[in-house]
Design a protein with these regions (language model features):
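PLP-dependent class I/II
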Residues: 1-130
Length: 130
């Protein structure tokens, strides 16, 4: 698929410590990611209903359907980065059914999420097919 992931010893040790000793932190993190997903979904439903934020499935990425945009899937992330300075994962790289979708990182502060959502929705409005 062209996606590679690596890990390092420090990251591995931090992950082990987080799961063994940081339950309150993990709970707050998961609550914040869920709140960020609700915020993003509501913003799209209100301001850009042609594009859909799908139900979360146990990850800190939102899966967003941008097939309503007049952009070829292969060009989507390039244009998004050039016009908004937002870097996302292009869904077509994750398999055939992902064309026209993006993965948007929710593991961020509320301030970053609000600014990114504003830019993403403005981009979608500029490129919507109708």
């Amino acid at each position: 698929m062209g996606v590679s992931y690596g890990q390092n010893l420090m990251g591995l040790e931090a992950t082990i410590a987080a799961f063994r000793e940081c339950e309150p932190w993990r709970i707050r993190l998961m609550e914040q990611i869920a709140a960020n997903h609700r915020f993003l979904k509501a913003a799209f439903e209100k301001n850009m209903p042609e594009c859909k934020v799908l139900q979360a499935e146990a990850t800190y990425f939102a899966w967003i359907d941008l097939r309503a945009l007049d952009i070829r899937p292969a060009q989507l992330t390039y244009l998004l980065e050039q016009e908004t300075q937002i870097v996302v994962e292009n869904g077509f790289r994750l398999g055939k059914g992902g064309a026209g979708f993006i993965r948007f990182n929710l593991a961020t502060s509320q301030e970053n999420l609000q600014e990114g959502t504003k830019r993403l929705i403005a981009f979608c409005k500029r490129h919507c097919k109708h």
